């Protein structure tokens, strides 16, 4: 290898991560590893380590007990007929769309859908009709909008072969009435896919109770797993199609390209699962804590957007006050990031002051009190500087 390249490689040998005491990042709160998962990460970190006793199908490996986890534990946890491990929620969505829809079909999705819903549909050759949100400040989705969107597309001669609901959405943390959406979709003859990337592993989600036909979840977002990893569950009538086997490679499932996560991601998910199951049972505590935190910030003039009272730990805030302070602050629009970092707080993206999102998930009340105090100090400091 040329010396011009090898001379640059030392930086890759021992990479470190800088993180503050309190991390508010919604992407990361639900994916923080348990001590058991960190131990599994070391034990099973080698590539293909899970395949010591594999007979050709990842989900049928018995040592470690992958088969039991995938075919017994996860279906009971999600309350769904059949489950597989994927590389993430997006891969699960694509597998479902590609197998259940035909190129040129339409899907109906909520207007708050994650960008990966759009990309999965595009990759599968599908068009999208949106159920628009209500706009500022709540950005809610009306379940009846699904009926309108399905019928509008059908009236134009298009086949609607799937509906997608983001539960909750990744911007505002809104939880739509999923059971009502499912009821409407089924009345119109359309299966519903529930994107639970921010719910499965944080809060109770029963596919059967919600009557969702397909559910996808994210291990690295919400199941205390190292990424990338996700789960894909389906009712039997759809599972038979999504998880169909190859005609030529009889023990390989086509949509999953045979085997998916073959090492650390899967074993960290399994090692964390007892903790994940326990924390799901304490979900109401997390909701109460999020509502308290929102009310405290609103007293400082930082306004929570989305549903109120809020029903999820992910929240979106707007603050004209912080934005005005940023105009004269020495570090400009990056001032909030640095002020919080100086106080041991991270997770709000650098450069954001006027609007930002955060999560209170699994953060102790006393740490959230520190965050509230930090915002109070920052606003007071900015006001004094402006007065001078």
UniProtKB/Swiss-Prot annotation:
Gene Ontology biological process: translation
Q: Per its Swiss-Prot or TrEMBL entry, what cofactor is needed?
A: pyridoxal 5'-phosphate
Give the quaternary structure.
Answer: Homodimer. Interacts with SepRS.
Q: What is this protein for, i.e. what is its function?
A: Converts O-phospho-L-seryl-tRNA(Cys) (Sep-tRNA(Cys)) to L-cysteinyl-tRNA(Cys) (Cys-tRNA(Cys)).
Which Pfam families does this chain map to?
SepSecS
What are the recorded GO MF terms, alphabetically?
A: Sep-tRNA:Cys-tRNA synthase activity
Per its UniProt record, what CDD domains does this chain match? SepCysS
Q: What is its EC number?
A: 2.5.1.73
Annotated protein name in UniProt:
O-phospho-L-seryl-tRNA:Cys-tRNA synthase
Q: What SUPFAM superfamilies does the annotation carry?
A: PLP-dependent transferases
Q: Which residues form the signal peptide?
A: none
Residues annotated as carrying N6-(pyridoxal phosphate)lysine in the record are: 221
Per the similarity annotation, which family is this? Belongs to the SepCysS family.
Describe the reaction catalysed, as an equation: O-phospho-L-seryl-tRNA(Cys) + hydrogen sulfide + H(+) = L-cysteinyl-tRNA(Cys) + phosphate
Query: In terms of domain of life, where is this protein from?
Result: Archaea
What are the protein's UniProt keywords?
A: Protein biosynthesis, Pyridoxal phosphate, Transferase
Q: Which residues bind pyridoxal 5'-phosphate?
A: 89-90, 195, 218-220
Return the InterPro entries for the record: Orn_Lys_Arg_decarboxylase-I, PyrdxlP-dep_Trfase, PyrdxlP-dep_Trfase_major, PyrdxlP-dep_Trfase_small, Sep_Cys-tRNA_synth_arc, SepSecS/SepCysS
């Amino acid at each position: 290898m040329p010396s011009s390249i090898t001379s640059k490689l030392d930086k890759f040998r021992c990479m470190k991560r800088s993180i503050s005491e309190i991390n508010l990042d919604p992407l990361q709160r639900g994916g923080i590893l348990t001590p058991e998962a960190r131990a599994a990460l070391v034990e099973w970190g080698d590539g293909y380590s899970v395949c010591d006793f594999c007979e050709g199908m990842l989900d049928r490996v018995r040592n470690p007990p992958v088969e039991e986890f995938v075919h017994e534990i996860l279906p009971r946890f999600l309350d769904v007929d059949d489950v597989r491990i994927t590389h993430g929620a997006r891969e699960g969505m694509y597998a479902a769309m590609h197998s259940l829809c035909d190129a040129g079909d339409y899907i109906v999705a909520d207007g708050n859908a994650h960008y990966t819903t759009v990309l999965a549909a595009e990759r599968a050759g599908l068009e999208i009709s949106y159920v628009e949100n209500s706009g500022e400040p709540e950005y809610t989705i009306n379940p009846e909008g699904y009926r309108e969107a399905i019928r509008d597309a059908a009236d134009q001669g298009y086949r609607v072969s799937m509906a997608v609901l983001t539960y909750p959405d990744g911007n505002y943390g809104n939880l739509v009435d999923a059971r009502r959406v499912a009821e409407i979709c089924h009345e119109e003859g359309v299966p519903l896919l529930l994107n639970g990337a921010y719910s499965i592993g944080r809060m109770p989600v029963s596919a059967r109770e919600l009557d969702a036909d397909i559910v996808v979840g994210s291990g690295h977002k919400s199941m205390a797993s190292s990424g990338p990893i996700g789960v894909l569950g389906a009712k039997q009538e759809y599972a038979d199609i999504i998880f169909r086997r190859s005609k030529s490679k009889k023990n390989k499932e086509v949509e999953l390209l045979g085997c998916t996560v073959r090492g650390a991601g899967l074993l960290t998910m399994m090692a964390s699962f007892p903790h994940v199951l326990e924390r799901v049972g304490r979900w109401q505590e997390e909701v109460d804590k999020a509502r308290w935190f929102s009310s405290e910030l609103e007293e400082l003039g930082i306004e929570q957007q989305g549903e109120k009272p809020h029903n999820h730990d992910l929240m979106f805030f707007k603050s004209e006050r912080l934005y005005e302070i940023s105009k004269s602050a020495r570090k400009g629009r990056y001032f909030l990031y640095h002020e919080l970092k100086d106080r041991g707080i991270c997770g709000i993206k650098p450069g954001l002051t006027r609007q930002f999102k955060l999560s209170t998930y699994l953060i102790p009340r006393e740490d959230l009190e520190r965050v509230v105090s930090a915002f109070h100090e920052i606003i007071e400091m900015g006001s004094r500087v402006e007065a001078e």
